[in-house]
Amino acid sequence: MRVADFTFELPDSLIARHPLAERRSSRLLTLDGPTGALAHRQFTDLLEHLRPGDLMVFNNTRVIPARLFGQKASGGKLEILVERVLDSHRVLAHVRSSKSPKPGSSILIDGGGEAEMVARHHALFELRFAEEVLPLLERVGHMPLPPYIDRPDEGADRERYQTVYAQRAGAVAAPTAGLHFDQPLLEAIAAKGVETAFVTLHVGAGTFQPVRVEQIEDHHMHSEWLEVGQDVVDAVAACRARGGRVIAVGTTSVRSLESAARDGELKSFSGDTDIFIYPGRPFHVVDALVTNFHLPESTLLMLVSAFAGYPETMAAYAGAIEHGYRFFSYGDAMFITRNPAPTAPQESAPEDHA
């Protein structure tokens, strides 16, 4: 399967660089998996697609202000993007500077703070801070907006690049499907008899890394930490018993649930995952999906194609572009029910050259 099969042309004007005034005011493109039918709605119309007894699974990770600016002892400027918090004082981070810092060297953080470069682990640097990491980041860190937003972070991003139910600090990118939900909408969902459960997957910066191989099967996913508790396992079992559907809010919730069910049975799990879901891979847990519009040739677009079917997904994206939907993290959303017989690119009907 070729990565190039997942490309599409997106007008720059459709990249959402700022959030809308209200979370719930996004548009919603629905895709019916069994038929491929599309419908253009508003995000609050999601309520019409939910049934009493359904279970919605959210990712409650909290985005940390993971971008720091500073300088080396030599005076050279650098930029730090925390990838993973290791403990109260240590992190793994990407460091951008003219010359990489050496082990044992000091880094002075703009706004106050100091770190030592401990060791290099491939592309990541292990840094030890003189004070506790999370309070330091809250004090002087910047929200790690995706590269395609292409603007400095603003004060409003601290609130809007964060779900209203975020609890567990550790992500360096938001689980963006959740950005559309406000408290009144969550209350309306509960009032309809829809249950909720929460997993945690700390989204890493690798989510924005391009796929650098030609064949999908040659791609190696970055690792991210996740936790699926026994309460989630029990909630899914209860949902199945009452005939409800498991609806994942975001691709990170999908990856969490399917990672915890790799052998076909959902079990509690805590640890790293590098699961790569692309067309041809079965789904063991998820019946429906709320998700944003993803980058061309991205692993997230491949996941959606695995869930909805490749031709159906690409047709939906073409329709979204035609109708002016806003793309990526601050953009609009889709609601997709699983295609029971999804096809992959190489399974599509061949062109007639007669």
Curated annotation (Swiss-Prot):
A Pfam family the protein falls into: Queuosine_synth
Catalyzed reaction equations: 7-aminomethyl-7-carbaguanosine(34) in tRNA + S-adenosyl-L-methionine = epoxyqueuosine(34) in tRNA + adenine + L-methionine + 2 H(+)
Gene3D superfamilies: QueA-like
One of the record's GO cellular component terms: cytoplasm
GO MF: S-adenosylmethionine:tRNA ribosyltransferase-isomerase activity
Listed GO biological process terms: queuosine biosynthetic process; tRNA wobble guanine modification
InterPro entries from the UniProt entry: QueA (IPR003699), QueA_dom1 (IPR042118), QueA_dom2 (IPR042119), QueA_sf (IPR036100)
EC number(s) per entry: 2.4.99.17
Pathway entry: tRNA modification; tRNA-queuosine biosynthesis
Location relative to the cell: Cytoplasm
Keywords per UniProt: Cytoplasm, Queuosine biosynthesis, S-adenosyl-L-methionine, Transferase
Principal location: cytoplasm
Family affiliation: Belongs to the QueA family.
Biological role: Transfers and isomerizes the ribose moiety from AdoMet to the 7-aminomethyl group of 7-deazaguanine (preQ1-tRNA) to give epoxyqueuosine (oQ-tRNA).
Subunit record text: Monomer.
Name of the protein this chain belongs to: S-adenosylmethionine:tRNA ribosyltransferase-isomerase
Organism of origin: Pseudomonas savastanoi pv. phaseolicola (strain 1448A / Race 6)
Gene: queA
